[in-house]
Design a protein with these regions (language model features):
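Hinge/capping helix and adjacent helix->loop/strand transition within the periplasmic-binding protein
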Residues: 92-98, 113-200, 248, 261-294
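N-terminal (or domain-start) structured segment
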Residues: 34-124, 163, 171, 187-214, ...
Length: 333
């Protein structure tokens, strides 16, 4: 018996045609977005308070970036929870290229190890856009501390277990991890005082409420003014700003490297053409002398690279710092 097709049910061919049209529509709309982007102001959320390294780098880059993109680029600070508050805000924003995150690389390489119940997955919910800078960490002490060299400082720490305190921008922050590296490799103990950002910690170091700090670069002007004493660099190489200051590796803490990477991220699903344009323009800005000078003044080195290379850097740090966090039983805020 011949069955007459029911016109109310689409055939397989019709379904495939509809799906193809839908896919083409998505591709066309994405391409159209990339062609017209940006046509309104762009917001960059910094997930640490104003005055810190992330904030200063963001402002150094976004100021000239405005001219390159032809739209205002507005910086907004949303600190707290180790950067997770600002990170979540960006991860849950529309993936249209108009909301970006400026963060240390710890957002994707450290926080997943610190916060097992994060409200978002930074690896899956954020896409790397561009690295901005590699910032060295500087071991600084209050001038009244009775030490003048890194060797004297380490001896003083060993002779006074638990009597010295150090400040950090928060539990699991890069300066905190640097201090935990120091405690592990030098076999010393000091009291950790976490803050909401590097700037308030620096103020208490200047005020004498803290004994030492791994500074991500915001206190170098105080070092030059004699208000803080710089003893060592917690990086693989000496700083060009202070070529006479040794690295911790040089004084016996072999392999010590706690550099902090900063960069820009976008919500996952942001059109690839938009990410490519942002990466290209940010890398151009990083090559200008004015931005180089501002990043160098922070104790950093401009780090232009592709999103793929930036992501690979985060993977390396994730393995390295993840092991430290587990060994030291470090907990997030």
């Amino acid at each position: 018996m011949h069955r007459v097709p029911n016109p109310s049910y689409p055939t397989t061919r019709h379904l495939l045609r509809s799906l193809a049209c839908a896919a083409a529509s998505v591709l066309l709309s994405t391409a159209a977005m990339a062609d017209t982007w940006p046509n309104k102001p762009i917001k960059v959320i910094v997930n640490f308070p104003a005055g810190g390294a992330a904030d200063q780098i963001a402002r150094a880059v976004t100021q000239p970036l405005q001219a390159a993109l032809g739209q205002p680029v507005v910086v907004e600070n949303r600190g707290g929870a180790g950067g997770n508050i600002g990170g979540e805000a960006v991860a849950k924003s529309p993936a249209d290229g108009y909301t970006l995150l400026m963060s240390s690389g710890g957002m994707v390489s450290v926080n997943p190890h610190l916060y097992p119940k994060m409200p978002f997955d930074p690896v899956k919910d954020l896409t790397p856009v561009a690295a901005a800078a590699r910032v060295l960490v500087f071991l600084e002490v209050r001038p009244s501390l009775p030490v003048n060299t890194i060797q004297e400082f380490l001896a003083h720490l060993k002779a006074n277990p638990g009597k010295l305190s150090f400040g950090t921008p928060g539990n699991g922050s890069s300066p905190h991890l640097a201090a935990e590296m120091l405690k592990t490799q030098a076999n010393v103990f000091a009291v950790h005082v976490p803050y909401r950002g590097a700037a308030p910690a620096m103020q208490d170091l200047l005020g004498g409420q803290l004994d030492f700090m791994f500074d991500p670069g915001i206190g170098l002007s105080h070092v030059k003014a004699g208000k803080l004493r710089l003893l060592a660099v917690g990086s693989a190489k000496r700083s060009p700003l202070f070529p006479d200051v040794p690295t911790l590796d040089e004084v016996g803490l072999k392999g010590f490297d706690a550099d902090t990477w900063f960069g820009f991220y976008a919500p996952a699903g942001t059109p690839p053409d938009v990410v490519t344009r942002l990466n290209r323009e940010i890398n151009k800005v990083l090559g200008t002398q004015a931005v180089k000078d501002r990043i160098t003044a922070l104790g950093g080195v401009p780090a232009p690279m592709s999103p793929t290379d930036f992501n690979a850097r985060a993977s390396i740090d994730s393995a390295r710092f993840g092991a430290l966090i587990k060994a030291r039983n470090i907990q997030g805020d």
